[in-house]
Amino acid sequence: MTEEEKINGENNYSASNIQVLEGLEAVRKRPAMYIGDISIKGLHHLVYEVVDNSIDEALAGYCDHIEVTINEDNSITVQDNGRGIPVDFHEKEQKSALEVVMTVLHAGGKFDKGSYKVSGGLHGVGVSCVNALSTHMTTQVFRNGKIYQQEYECGHPLYSVKEVGVTEITGTRQQFWPDDTIFTETVYNYDILATRMRELAYLNAGIKITLTDLRVKEEDGNYKQEIFYSVEGLKEFVRYIDSSREHLVNDVIYINTEKQGTPVEVAIMYNTSYNENIHSYVNNINTIEGGTHLAGFRRALTRTLKKYAEDNKMLEKAKVEISGDDFREGLTAVISIKVAEPQFEGQTKTKLGNNEVMGAVDQAVGEALSYYLEEHPKESKMIVDKVILAAQARVAARKARESVQRKSPMSGGGMPGKLADCSSKDPEECELFLVEGDSAGGSAKQGRNRTFQAILPLRGKILNVEKAMWHKAFESDEVNNIIQALGIRFGVDGEDSKEANIDKLRYKKVIIMTDADVDGSHIDTLIMTLFFRYFPQVIQQGYLYIATPPLYLCTKGKVKEYCWTDQQRQKFIDTYGGGSENAIHTQRYKGLGEMNPEQLWETTMNPENRMLKQVHLENAAEADYTFSMLMGEDVGPRRDFIEKNATYANIDA
């Protein structure tokens, strides 16, 4: 963008563009309503709200560099080189436009169509929400050759906007300190921020995002830093997601167009895996529950591929009926669209409801894919051959499921014989423990509360579904036992489909309970992979948990304490043993089977005392990449990951 264009843009972006919708008081009273929650997720959401403002400037064409810094004191600084928030007088509010943006909820250029055609941010509450939830916030605006500043406490300005210097740059710098009386966690996680910044860089090609952590110095003496920048955007994004998978076709099928007034960008790649991995975004928001844009994409993909295959008489050898699922096996795709007024619905407000979008995406994908298939007959044949193989495997899987249901020794009501069910039939209160090994399963069965806790022992390591064909999973006893115990069906409205249906889910808490060792962690990961690939809705709706049995029982005389970490154990030694390890008795639990039923209940199963880790699907594309890298065929990336995360690997699935 030329300086002249930027100056014209500055002239057009002023106080008159700032629209005000409502006041701030409610935010501090009900923060979760505005940012999702007040734990680690909400804490990081504050950063995303500020960065979204800068991304909006970039989408409008006025900004190409965003710097995000985690400061030593866990405050955050975000600076961009956009036009700077307007500082002129706002007629209606009778104060500076900057103060309006910073102190009034839903005030900002994103609500005035002339300023931004589209804007990011799921909750769209703007930077004022961040201000309200911070003990202190400082805003500096670089605009018109001057530096303007205002500071706030809990959303209230400490003084009017004032000039504090001169400058040759333009942009906005925000620094904020999250309020520890509101947030249960105030320590920022670098990896969580890096994941989102990487995602934003891929979704917005040409924008440089620098992330720096002033709390950590590298071996070379410099602060920890990454620069996220993508020239090719979505093309690079699908390559990144698929980096540990074997490609079926080396091409990335790339679509970047506008249909019916909706900008549509799509990147498609086929690999040799058996999973469908489609990640959809609206205005940079990950629409985990899909919506009309995803429906339009699927419709176009199925119709176009099927027509090409039929026209070229390629389906005659299939001998089975082809369904929509079959066209998507081994597919990795990213769909990114921009919508002026998105309507979000669904359980987590991440499902797009705009009907007009379906036709736009359908048309864009249909036209581009049809052209690609005609121009690349060799690659097209490889894709269609994989579709036929997928259809045959799906039919084999259905037969395997039916066969298991006929043959397997079931307890009453078609449940696995090993399942020790609970007496309650209310899914809201029922819990299912997936327990490693029969001996631990025995202790769990004796120690549980039979009213609402069910136990399903698993024999050894379950099948790694990342490497298995679809029908192989249904030939596995352990996988089938889990599916049947949970009451999961496949297919919607009687259709033979891979889509999991959890409408009749029997337990709203599914708890993985394994030994606190390497083998136990491996089993955790195998089970999480099964859920992520075959019935991700269980994770999306927050029903999957991991139990955390204690590592030690420390005893000194009559004082007993269970310890979950080495730090807790050390604290016990310092408190009761005068710092001497020999002065206390430590029992190290190597497995669940070493605990008697009462101990297992007391430490790991009793809702009053236990600690559960909820498995979140925070970032589907990153989880997709992590699972394929950890559980796939390629050893190199897995070794690198394990070496980098040797002491602590956080699979934020």
What do the PLM-derived regions correspond to, one by one?
Residues 29-48:
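Conserved short strand/loop->alpha-helix "switch" segment adjacent to the catalytic nucleotide/phosphoryl-transfer site
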Residues 90-91, 98:
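Short adenine-binding "F-helix/F-box" segment of the Bergerat
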Residues 2-17, 24, 46-48, 56-58, ...:
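GHKL-family ATPase ATP-binding module
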Residues 84-89:
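A short glycine-centered beta->alpha linker in the GHKL/HATPase_c
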